[in-house]
Design a protein with these regions (language model features):
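Extracytoplasmic catalytic/substrate-binding loops of multi-pass membrane glycan-assembly enzymes
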Residues: 29-47, 61-76, 85, 185, ...
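Short acidic/glycine- and proline-prone juxtamembrane loop motifs at membrane-interface regions
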Residues: 133-143, 359-360
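Membrane-lumen/periplasm interface segments of specific transmembrane helices
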Residues: 182, 188, 193-306, 399-411
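Membrane-interface alpha helices of multi-pass inner-membrane proteins
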Residues: 122, 168-185, 192-196, 214-220, ...
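Transmembrane-helix motifs of polytopic, lipid-linked glycan transferases
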Residues: 89-112, 150, 154
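Loop-to-helix entry region of an early transmembrane alpha helix in multi-pass inner-membrane enzymes
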Residues: 64, 68, 72, 80-100, ...
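Specific aromatic-rich, kink-prone transmembrane helix
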Residues: 49, 101, 143-163, 170-178, ...
Length: 416
């Protein structure tokens, strides 16, 4: 068994097996976590058809605030795959690039880590319900994730080479691909805020100005879209900030809890060395959530994340949800203390995803990627030291995936 894992066979086998499971889900028209992606595919298909004869049509004419790039791509694919079944099947094949690109990113970020572990971690992507149904129903989240991971790939290469004096190809490519992600799903524009701060910290002033001009040129179509269709901004911002903070913290806690738990179980020194910090963070997190809960008002039937629905389903109240929000603030604060740029990105994520409807799919598997690829933390390499951590994470995500399938089949949350 030891020789099997050292050769990387287990990780590659998992990748192959789980990619096959995706096509099994395709065969059965899997709609884990609800029929939203399936409904989107058919509801917006007229938009795709009209884009075959028109370069640009705003999505508002078809009842959506999504930006058009994904649907423009589908319209071109439809010229080749005239049957929607085969178009979806081709898109399902393309979606395998998401976990593969995640693996390529991991190879750069964790040079000294066994490739077998990186394959195993990347393969876990196939079990996230949002990834699966988005792949099966040719959803724009997959297109955006591909562009996002291409951007992070060149971002990590740029950081590794430390070429901060010139406008390198890695710099240009990362902003181009992030721009494409934005034109697919507009909330990816939040990452430009983070990147501009990083660029300002690392680049020479003249290089920073040149790059800013490149980004300005890339953003011109976006400004035109906002001018012609101002309502697209509503997708990414709402005045109910207190509600958004609680939901976002709870959703991010969902992905952080198993990682932190595994690390603390296997390395108690990390916990013992930071007891004072954790106690302070716990105290202030409880105070913050206690205050925000007084202003919390949200219809759990239109999103809110796994823990909110679980809280209502089991306890008929929001107490479990508030507890996970507290845990989320504690863990996010811990990451913020590790690195100031972590703090900046976490604030952007907490505040930026302040939509009037917040779904777990906005963070899945994007936040999982962010933790391992973008955050500067000792916890990620610590987690990857032990195969048991990956096993426990697989069990956690598998139960999550299973619960999503059961919920979809029995319509449990839909009938609450």
């Amino acid at each position: 068994m030891k020789n099997f894992t050292n050769n990387g066979n287990l990780g590659k086998f998992s990748f192959l097996l789980l990619s096959i499971s995706l096509f099994v889900g395709f065969y059965f028209n899997e709609t884990a976590s609800g029929i939203g992606a399936k409904a989107d595919f058919y509801n917006y298909w007229p938009w795709v058809l009209d884009l075959k004869d028109n370069f640009y049509i705003p999505g508002t004419k078809y009842g959506t605030l999504h930006l058009p790039l994904h649907y423009m791509i589908l319209s071109k694919l439809n010229l080749v795959f005239t049957d929607t079944y085969f178009l979806r099947l081709f898109f399902c094949f393309i979606s395998i690039f998401v976990p593969f690109l995640f693996y390529l990113n991991l190879k750069i970020k964790f040079r000294s880590t066994e490739e077998n572990k990186l394959w195993l971690l990347a393969s876990l992507t196939f079990l996230f319900p949002s990834f699966r149904y988005s792949s099966i129903w040719a959803n724009g989240h997959i297109t955006a994730l591909i562009f996002f991971l291409l951007s992070t790939l060149f971002f990590l290469k740029w950081l590794e080479k430390r070429n901060y004096e010139t406008l390198s190809l890695n710099l240009i490519l990362q902003v181009i691909f992030l721009s494409l992600a934005v034109y697919t799903r507009q909330y990816y524009a939040l990452f430009f805020i983070y990147l501009m701060i990083v660029y300002f910290q690392k680049l020479k002033l003249n290089t920073f100005i040149k790059l800013a001009l490149v980004i300005l040129v890339l953003s011109l179509p976006g400004f035109w879209i906002i001018y012609s269709t101002p309502s697209v901004l509503k997708v990414t911002f709402s005045k109910e900030l207190s509600t958004s903070l609680l939901i976002n913290a709870s959703i991010m806690a969902f992905y952080l809890i198993p990682i932190f738990a595994c690390i603390f179980i296997n390395n108690r020194k990390i916990l013992n060395n930071n007891k004072k910090q954790l106690l302070i963070l716990t105290f202030f997190s409880i105070l913050l959530v206690s205050f925000l809960s007084l202003l919390f008002e949200y219809n759990f039937k239109i999103g809110g994340g796994f823990f909110l629905k679980l809280s209502v389903m089991i306890f008929k109240n929001n107490f479990l949800f508030y507890l996970t929000s507290i845990i989320g603030f504690i863990l996010l604060s811990y990451l913020s203390i590790e690195d100031k740029n972590n703090f900046i990105l976490i604030v952007i994520l907490l505040i930026g995803f302040s939509a009037y409807m917040i779904f777990q799919k906005y963070f899945e598997p994007m936040f999982f990627f962010i933790f391992f690829l973008i955050f500067n933390s000792k916890l990620a390499p610590e987690f990857l030291k032990n195969y048991k951590n990956l096993l426990y994470l697989y069990i956690y995500v598998f139960f999550y995936f299973t619960s999503a399938i059961i919920n979809d089949f029995l319509s449990i949350t839909a009938n609450l």
